[in-house]
Amino acid sequence: MFDGGVPEQIHRFIASPPPPPPLPPHQPAAERSLPFPVSFSSFNTNHQPQHMLSLDSRKIIHHHHHHHHHDIKDGGATTGEWIGQTDHDDSDNHHQHHHHHPWCSDEVLALLRFRSTVENWFPEFTWEHTSRKLAEVGFKRSPQECKEKFEEEERRYFNSNNNNNNNTNDHQHIGNYNNKGNNYRIFSEVEEFYHHGHDNEHVSSEVGDNQNKRTNLVEGKGNVGETVQDLMAEDKLRDQDQGQVEEASMENQRNSIEVGKVGNVEDDAKSSSSSSLMMIMKEKKRKKRKKEKERFGVLKGFCEGLVRNMIAQQEEMHKKLLEDMVKKEEEKIAREEAWKKQEIERVNKEVEIRAQEQAMASDRNTNIIKFISKFTDHDLDVVQNPTSPSQDSSSLALRKTQGRRKFQTSSSLLPQTLTPHNLLTIDKSLEPFSTKTLKPKNQNPKPPKSDDKSDLGKRWPKDEVLALINIRRSISNMNDDDHKDENSLSTSSKAVPLWERISKKMLEIGYKRSAKRCKEKWENINKYFRKTKDVNKKRPLDSRTCPYFHQLTALYSQPPTGTTATTATTATSARDLDTRPEENRVGSQDPDISVPMHVDGDGAGDKSNVQFSGFDLEF
């Protein structure tokens, strides 16, 4: 660039250039971002930017100074040196990345403007979009170049801020700021980019105050009137059409030399404006941090409320769960207690029942022991006191005559003694009787035989059954009489067993039955009688099942003192035997089962007959 030049020219380029013309007052931030209007088109030659015109004129001055340096005055030299210094700084900063294609100020401002309008969501897409926007306004740059240039301007901006903070009260601040005065417009654009969200009116008011201060300082000098007129002219030119923009820019170029004479005053105004901007930035940062803290506090309170509500719900659910568990456990315990009580009651009942059974068993055992002891004593008496056959025959004849008298006297009293009772018919198939042929009465009975095989399988006719009942009753009455009169027949009655005497009585009447058969028949009769007597039901007189029921009832219900009822029953039975058919006769069957013990009460003063396992127990 300086090939063929003089060393003095290099010295002049190194010298500090005058500051650029100040920004017009009350200029909005959106209008300060670019030196051309929004409707700018890079292909329209009639709308040439103001800054480009001034830059071209400066280049022309610089070119003229390059060839005719001996004809230029101090003001022109100063202007040429400022232009040269601007190009020199740009060439130093952009030498590495933009050696062949340097960035002009308009291009940098357009880059900052487009970059400030794009959100930094996707970096690569952002720089591609910025590159396309630059291409639309006539600047062809790649996304990588745009990114590198923006980062470079960003570093310069931060370096400028650091220098201003460190040298606020130092006189060197004016010189440092003058060295960066050529990039003032770019500095303001970068600052606008980093503080894009702030209020534009507040910034414009601060800038207006700074311009007022600067105007007051300029009025203290010699050329204050001219400067104010130029500033007012610039304000008017900004509102005019695009055709008048070129004339205003030329006037600014002519007046820039006069403005340079008051450079020191302008530097003071710029330093004060920059310090005020820094204070505004700090205040806005503080407010921003305060707002962020408030938002964070609101978010924190909201999250804490959610957590508290969730914890309260969890505690309530846990409490309900515990209550349900306690309730279930109490119900379970109550059920177990009720079950235990029921089991205890059941066990107690079983114990009571067992105690009763044991008492009954003990009573039964006691009765059996008494019977066995009495029976053994009875057998011993029979063995020790045998009687002669003559005595037996005489006693039997006497008793036979007494029985006949009783039978004759009681025949007239039979209708009065028989009364209806509550009876229940029993199936004859439950305990069938063994069949036997009916034998006529033997007027001349033969002596009984000792073997029992002769009467096996023979039926018991009804008259024979009635005879057995009457004989059993008569022997019981005779035993009572023997107890009253011990001197009469007590010795003979005790000498022979009960069923042996009954068998002999049956043989005298004409029925040949052994003592064992008589005993078995008597047990069967009592068994059927007990079954029918336990049921409280009326029983007809002509019932086929257990036809001797009424006789047994009358037998057990009559008083023991008299014998008229027995004879009457015998006479009635004899008459019934002649009138009833043959099929009504009841037989007997040998029972092989064990019959439980039963005590037959014949009335007050009568002996009890105990039947147990085929034995006739009397006590």
Curated annotation (Swiss-Prot):
Q: Which GO terms describe its cellular component?
A: nucleus
Name of the protein this chain belongs to: Trihelix transcription factor GTL2
Mark out the compositionally biased spans (Basic and acidic residues).
Answer: 448-458, 575-585
> Annotated motif Nuclear localization signal: location in the chain?
503-510
Function summary? Probable transcription factor that binds specific DNA sequence.
Q: Which organism is it from?
A: Arabidopsis thaliana
- Where is the protein found, in the record's own terms? Nucleus
Record flagged with keyword Transcription: yes
* Matching PROSITE patterns: MYB_LIKE
Ranges of compositional bias, category Pro residues:
16-27
Which lineage ranks, top first, belong to the organism behind this chain? Eukaryota, Viridiplantae, Streptophyta, Embryophyta, Tracheophyta
